[in-house]
């Protein structure tokens, strides 16, 4: 096939064009080779591992839940204390579910009328981010009755008087909490009135088959074998593309045995060290007088480090509007709490914990490694505002943590500990207010007796 040059093209220009075409192969041959791929650094590996681990902790629990018999869109009412995840709140009756929704089906939730008792129905996505709460604080004009949790923009016809709640996720973890208070039987009666059902026939998600590992034994390079499946769940937080690209790059690179070994070594050195360094302040939190308070919880933005640490040490945490957590792990001398020893904690009369919570407060002691409550013959695992507390003459409140009840200490002021176990205290304020809500408050020092 011949090619005719436009008549308007001058002879000089035509000569130049032909010469350029003839020389093109030579020019291409002289093009420098592409730069080698950028090496994956130890910091890249640490960042990617910590990010991915946060998701794997959720999928691990999801697989365990379904193995234990849970089914989609079914609310399971648990007996008080009968839950199996790190740092549960033992002051509430829990109900739990996994929810699947799509463009044509919502999940309907019935909430009973609850008076003078804390309650909420919390919805989280597959990364441990809280998407919604149903309670009288979020819906003061519709605190109970019928609700429908729907995929955003889903076209679903709902019954009248149903409060629709749109969420950006197809898979949801649900926790319903009802404060036990002094009348546990009433709390359990209310708990069983919370109900859940799909509005139609949703296309149910598959339970992701990712790595299952022991809670106290973090995985190494094998975590990245699950990267493709794990990242199928969208992360709603902005700016995660770069760290997700690192995850995918490492998952591809470890096909080479030598690179796999290098990544594994890097995880066990730098990534684990970075986690250990961030743990005392729960990511980017603050520590004071032996207590740590996370900078955020429940919703994390770009702080995936804190999200992963919370998923590891206290999965399903709610937002700071609902509850604020303080973790106490050291006494006034900076030494870790030992179940063999005796300690005291005194709240001044002007800063009693009840004055900083709209609903209630509690303190729980858990093993520092397993995050499970400390076993004791009394089966007493927390102290809260429902206990038979005795106040000091000056109005202050002193609590005791010891393997046996100290002399002249009221029974309600004592939380038993387990000899030989290193532990930490978790102080919760439900409906935080005042200096707790603003972040200015920190609990008093824990004194070694």
Feature-to-residue mapping (PLM):
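Bacterial N-terminal signal peptides that target proteins for export
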Residues: 1-16
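Selective for proline/serine-rich intrinsically disordered segments
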Residues: 4, 23, 30-34
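C-terminal segment of classical bacterial N-terminal signal peptides
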Residues: 16-27
């Amino acid at each position: 096939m011949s090619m005719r040059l436009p008549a308007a093209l001058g002879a000089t220009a035509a000569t130049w064009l032909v010469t350029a075409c003839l020389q093109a192969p030579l020019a291409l041959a002289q093009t420098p080779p592409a730069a080698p791929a950028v090496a994956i650094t130890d910091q890249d590996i640490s960042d990617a591992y910590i990010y991915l681990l946060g998701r794997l902790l959720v999928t691990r629990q999801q697989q365990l839940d379904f193995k234990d018999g849970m089914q989609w869109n079914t609310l399971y009412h648990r007996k008080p204390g009968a839950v199996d995840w790190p740092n549960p709140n033992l002051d509430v009756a829990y109900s739990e579910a996994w929810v699947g929704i799509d463009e044509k089906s919502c999940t309907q939730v019935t909430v009973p009328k609850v008076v003078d008792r804390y309650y909420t129905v919390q919805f989280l996505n597959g990364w441990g981010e809280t998407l919604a709460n149903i309670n009288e604080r979020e819906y003061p004009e519709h605190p109970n009755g019928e609700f429908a949790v729907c995929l955003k923009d889903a076209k679903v016809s709902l019954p009248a008087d149903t409060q629709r709640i749109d969420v950006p996720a197809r898979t949801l973890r649900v926790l319903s909490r009802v404060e036990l208070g002094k009348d546990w039987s009433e709390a359990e009666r209310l708990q069983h009135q919370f109900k859940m059902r799909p509005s139609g026939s949703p296309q149910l998600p598959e339970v992701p088959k990712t790595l299952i590992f022991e809670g106290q034994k973090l995985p190494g390079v094998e975590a990245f074998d699950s990267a493709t499946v794990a990242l199928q769940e969208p992360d709603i937080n902005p700016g995660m593309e770069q760290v997700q690209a690192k995850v995918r790059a490492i998952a591809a690179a470890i096909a080479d045995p030598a690179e796999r070994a290098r990544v594994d070594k890097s995880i066990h050195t730098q990534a684990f060290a970075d986690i250990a360094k961030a743990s005392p302040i729960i990511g980017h939190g603050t520590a004071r007088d032996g207590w740590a308070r996370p900078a955020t919880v429940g919703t994390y933005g770009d702080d995936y480090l804190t999200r992963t640490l919370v998923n590891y040490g206290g999965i399903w945490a709610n937002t700071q509007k609902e509850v604020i957590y303080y973790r106490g792990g050291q006494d006034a001398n900076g030494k870790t709490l030992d179940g063999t020893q005796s300690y005291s904690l005194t709240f001044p009369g002007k800063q009693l914990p009840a004055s900083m919570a709209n609903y209630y407060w509690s303190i729980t002691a858990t093993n520092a490694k397993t995050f499970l409550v400390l076993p004791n013959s009394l089966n007493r695992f927390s102290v809260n505002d429902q206990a038979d507390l005795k106040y000091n003459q000056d109005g202050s409140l002193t609590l005791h943590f010891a393997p046996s009840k100290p002399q002249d200490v009221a029974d309600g002021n004592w939380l038993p500990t387990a000899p030989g176990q290193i532990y930490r205290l978790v102080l919760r304020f439900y409906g935080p207010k005042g200096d707790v809500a603003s972040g200015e408050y920190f609990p008093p020092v824990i004194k070694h007796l």
